[in-house]
Amino acid sequence: MALNDKSIPHETKVVVLLIPFPAQGHLNQFLHLSRLIVAQNIPVHYVGTVTHIRQATLRYNNPTSNIHFHAFQVPPFVSPPPNPEDDFPSHLIPSFEASAHLREPVGKLLQSLSSQAKRVVVINDSLMASVAQDAANISNVENYTFHSFSAFNTSGDFWEEMGKPPVGDFHFPEFPSLEGCIAAQFKGFRTAQYEFRKFNNGDIYNTSRVIEGPYVELLELFNGGKKVWALGPFNPLAVEKKDSIGFRHPCMEWLDKQEPSSVIYISFGTTTALRDEQIQQIATGLEQSKQKFIWVLREADKGDIFAGSEAKRYELPKGFEERVEGMGLVVRDWAPQLEILSHSSTGGFMSHCGWNSCLESITMGVPIATWPMHSDQPRNAVLVTEVLKVGLVVKDWAQRNSLVSASVVENGVRRLMETKEGDEMRQRAVRLKNAIHRSMDEGGVSHMEMGSFIAHISK
């Protein structure tokens, strides 16, 4: 099944085929990248399962009419609810494994596109490399790997794989333990995908040299002569007040009435469920902090967000929402995160530190109270707090199996929102935001990096 699929004129010089990993943070980054490439007048084809194409387009607030979506059927997969006792989203693994069956339809699509264009450029998520493997067998197809993680995280991974060799005068900060970052059953899937990265023509990161310059340079050093592009940030730097169909979320009307930088936004991403007792502690801590807040409290995504029963509704302390009326909002549906972060009333973000969320917060000049849960998130938290110094720790990864008490939540919120320390973080975050925005202007380092990539694939 193909959505918005149009035939390609034979004189088309280059088309781009994007293969995202089927998790919300990955789907979203690929949609942002699609928007940037389409703006260069290059046709973009975006592939996925029927379920995940529907999910991606449903949650994306920007126009997608210029993107050619291809929604393919894959074998049925179980879609269990998230397990709050499991910090890693193991409940999503069946959907990941089902998406590996995209190889055959993607291969057929590649054959078709390669017969209609002079060059086809495949950009696949590093966790979907097996799906793109047939690109190596078609003479006018080039393959690039997109890493949906920070350069800090990935360069650290490579450095450790190489045995931590000395790299001049450069020193990594102390990394948090990898224990608990990835479930055992996911390691095999990841390892199998990484076997195919040797076939690629280069690597792409959603970052900027303004944010992670030294770590991008390390990736270039470690990459065996293959090109590395830091093409980010992918997300829009200016956000429309309404989405593409004219809707504005009610929480934005509430934000309009608040003082500048007075609201902390709390969201822990789309993949991991919190334990009931942890939710109680967060609620109590927020109430005791006396700070304005927007808290997104919804069940983590299932592998198929459209399947099965209604999502779980989390219980809050009795009378909580009545007591915090006027002080805070609890949002139980999908929230417009980028719009919230871009609003002048938002002054902080309590986050799980997924890279997509980190980048959105950094590009909007909002400091982060870190609460990592799995995967790359603990290292992203170190980047935010120790390297960029635009955040503070709420959940210490060294105490990852412990309940975060209400007093710790309260203290973290107060430190970020009402202390000199928090004000200094906000000032650093705004300076970094301004530097990023300048880098995207004509002549800026990020603008030139994108120009370099477009010229490379269009040659």
Curated annotation (Swiss-Prot):
InterPro entries: UDP_glucos_trans, UDP_glycos_trans_CS
Residues annotated as binding UDP-alpha-D-glucose: 148, 335, 337, 352, 355-357, 360, 376-377
Catalytic residues as annotated in Swiss-Prot or TrEMBL: 26, 125
GO molecular function, one term: trans-zeatin O-beta-D-glucosyltransferase activity
Keywords: Glycosyltransferase, Transferase
List of residues binding an anthocyanidin: 26
EC number, as in UniProt: 2.4.1.203
PROSITE patterns recorded: UDPGT (PS00375)
Pfam short name (any one): UDPGT
Substrates-to-products reaction catalysed: trans-zeatin + UDP-alpha-D-glucose = O-beta-D-glucosyl-trans-zeatin + UDP + H(+)
A GO biological-process term: flower morphogenesis
UniProt enzyme class: transferase
Family, per entry: Belongs to the UDP-glycosyltransferase family.
Function: May regulate active versus storage forms of cytokinins, and could have an impact on seed growth. Can also use UDP-xylose to catalyze the formation of O-xylosylzeatin but at much lower affinity.
Protein name: Zeatin O-glucosyltransferase
Organism: Phaseolus lunatus (Lima bean)
